Amino acid sequence: MEAVAVAAAVGVLLLAGAGGAAGDEAREAAAVRALVARLLGPGPAADFSVSVERALAAKPGLDTYSLGGGGAARVRVRGSTGVAAAAGLHRYLRDFCGCHVAWSGSQLRLPRPLPAVPGELTEATPNRYRYYQNVCTQSYSFVWWDWARWEREIDWMALNGINLALAWSGQEAIWQRVYLALGLTQAEINEFFTGPAFLAWGRMGNLHTWDGPLPPSWHIKQLYLQHRVLDQMRSFGMTPVLPAFAGHVPEAVTRVFPQVNVTKMGSWGHFNCSYSCSFLLAPEDPIFPIIGSLFLRELIKEFGTDHIYGADTFNEMQPPSSEPSYLAAATTAVYEAMTAVDTEAVWLLQGWLFQHQPQFWGPAQIRAVLGAVPRGRLLVLDLFAESQPVYTRTASFQGQPFIWCMLHNFGGNHGLFGALEAVNGGPEAARLFPNSTMVGTGMAPEGISQNEVVYSLMAELGWRKDPVPDLAAWVTSFAARRYGVSHPDAGAAWRLLLRSVYNCSGEACRGHNRSPLVRRPSLQMNTSIWYNRSDVFEAWRLLLTSAPSLATSPAFRYDLLDLTRQAVQELVSLYYEEARSAYLSKELASLLRAGGVLAYELLPALDEVLASDSRFLLGSWLEQARAAAVSEAEADFYEQNSRYQLTLWGPEGNILDYANKQLAGLVANYYTPRWRLFLEALVDSVAQGIPFQQHQFDKNVFQLEQAFVLSKQRYPSQPRGDTVDLAKKIFLKYYPRWVAGSW
């Protein structure tokens, strides 16, 4: 591939979402000033001046910020866009003031006077885009959010330099208008949509119907929310990505148009065709462009556009044909439905399909898709590039621009995990790849509010031209900023975590918590890990040692709880291994001892310490869902949606425990009863001399799991107990056993 062709493709894309007029500069500057006031308060905000100047960018499309002043003068923050100015503000707060902004909270103690910036500090991003989100994030993390929570997230996005992000709320209301216009009945539409917690997979054609329908109030509230989200994103100069038609239609379309050419796709995620097996329009069917253009026209009429659209036709679904001609036609149909309405359309495609089913997506099939859209009009997300990059085996996506993304988290699971070395070096390697068409970096987790160190690093890399030279020094500074003070034991704890849980490498690294703690028990559970458990326990000890100095820091208390949770997760694996070994050896006394500690001491202790922090409460999680409702019946429905997603995921445990969380209440009333039932079954097996029957246990435990989902029990949404005291209590009981190797 010639470098000229690559440059031309990237050049076309750089036109998308390019900076606007002087009026936009003023609006973006005002948005950043408002952010400063929200973040720091009106008093400290007066010490900052903010301006947006397009001419500041050294090259078109490359965001640039400049910092100056401070000391006796106001701090000057200038940016080529609002996002650039916000990123510059964050740089000043982070590197000059030692502040920290994160999902779990912020540490914003400003030095007085404000530190002066030596001379003028100017920084330009090496790439056009810093992308954020995954289609699944909309369901695993955002689904129940109100405007206040969205406003905080958009502030976080701006501070971290995000300038390209999905904005997919409210689309079902638009689809409802389109389907009604096509002749579907309201009942048919209601039957098609999933419940709120599963909309991400309805939007990608994986599911329909499951745990629906959507109440009318849902559409109204989501439309309102989408308008506010879009207004706020655009006020910073971000480019929102709107949805487009990917080809999936309700079955009822075949009633209205009996001659329509559709293919019934295969099942997905162990669901049967009552909830899966979507209908995909043939690309040559004349109704394809009609539906696609109807939807996009109505969407743009409602929300406006920034000309980048997301659509995923074959997400985790095998296409009806592997013939390159079919795949090219299917791709062309989606793209032409966009350009029929918006001649400037750029298609944002999640590259997950190429990674997820490599046995289907051979070179010819990949070329067919990538070559069916003009170069520069398809923007591919290399979604899991930190672990399994696709650009390296597709010649940089055959010349189409791509964004190097860190996926990191699956299902919104809790669990300390990261591949920081791979993340640190990945973007530079992609930029230096022969004839690279990389145009950005991205964060694409399925769920957020976990492992914040990973996202701090990735956000920083979006503005760096090279990797962080010393990750150990970087993580030590991260801890000092996070807690507001440097502490040797806390820094040492973080360096141990860096070399252990945050040092996963190789293709086996998937950010999915498969710990026995959060899985349906069996005798075949995998307890293998990529790190030395000693590092986790020693980091735990060091963090507790620093508690007398750091316990007033909310971030420290959060991290201490999270590390205690991780230590208990390790202990559960160890006691499980002992119980399994005792069962296989038919040693009843050892089985009773190990199983008793696991199910009757360790798990209750975990639930108790989790209950000390509102961010680890099932009650808080479910209250979000209930608060989105306008009636008690709706609140019950939304809560059940949320319970299903956390546990069974489908009516029969179809994707069981995929979205597992470690929350107080969930541990006590879901994970603990499962473990007790399992261990009691093992004890009965040994005592009576009969084999343990996994299939019978699965039937029995499903009754417990389903009962939890259908339960109306309410859980506290306010924390109780002191995190430090409870963590110390667990530590003093189990750490000596770990050191002695006595279980």
UniProtKB/Swiss-Prot annotation:
Tissue specificity: Liver, ovary, peripheral blood leukocytes, testis, prostate, spleen, colon, lung, placenta and kidney.
Compartments in which it is found: Lysosome
UniProt effect for mutating R565W: In MPS3B; accounts for approximately 6% of the mutant alleles in Australasian patients with MPS3B
SUPFAM superfamilies: (Trans)glycosidases (SSF51445)
GO biological process, one term: response to wounding
Reactions the enzyme catalyzes: Hydrolysis of terminal non-reducing N-acetyl-D-glucosamine residues in N-acetyl-alpha-D-glucosaminides
Consequence when changing R38W: In MPS3B; decreases the enzyme activity markedly
Recorded consequence of changing W156C: In MPS3B; no enzyme activity; synthesizes a polypeptide with a molecular size similar to that of the wild-type
Entry annotated with the keyword Transmembrane: no
EC number in record: 3.2.1.50
GO cellular component: extracellular exosome; lysosomal lumen; lysosome; membrane
GO molecular function: alpha-N-acetylglucosaminidase activity
Signal peptide interval: 1-23
Top EC category: hydrolase
Impact noted for substituting G412E: In MPS3B; does not yield active enzyme
Keyword vocabulary terms for this entry: Charcot-Marie-Tooth disease, Disease variant, Glycoprotein, Glycosidase, Hydrolase, Lysosome, Mucopolysaccharidosis, Neurodegeneration, Neuropathy, Signal
Positions glycosylated per UniProt: N261, N272, N435, N503, N526, N532
Outcome reported for the amino acid change (mutating R520W): In MPS3B; no enzyme activity; synthesizes a polypeptide with a molecular size similar to that of the wild-type
Subunit record text: Monomer and homodimer.
Known role: Involved in the degradation of heparan sulfate.
Pathology noted in the entry: Mucopolysaccharidosis 3B: A form of mucopolysaccharidosis type 3, an autosomal recessive lysosomal storage disease due to impaired degradation of heparan sulfate. MPS3 is characterized by severe central nervous system degeneration, but only mild somatic disease. Onset of clinical features usually occurs between 2 and 6 years; severe neurologic degeneration occurs in most patients between 6 and 10 years of age, and death occurs typically during the second or third decade of life. Charcot-Marie-Tooth disease, axonal, type 2V: An axonal form of Charcot-Marie-Tooth disease, a disorder of the peripheral nervous system, characterized by progressive weakness and atrophy, initially of the peroneal muscles and later of the distal muscles of the arms. Charcot-Marie-Tooth disease is classified in two main groups on the basis of electrophysiologic properties and histopathology: primary peripheral demyelinating neuropathies (designated CMT1 when they are dominantly inherited) and primary peripheral axonal neuropathies (CMT2).
Family: Belongs to the glycosyl hydrolase 89 family.
Protein name per its UniProtKB record: Alpha-N-acetylglucosaminidase
High-level lineage: Eukaryota, Metazoa, Chordata, Craniata, Vertebrata
UniProt gene name: NAGLU
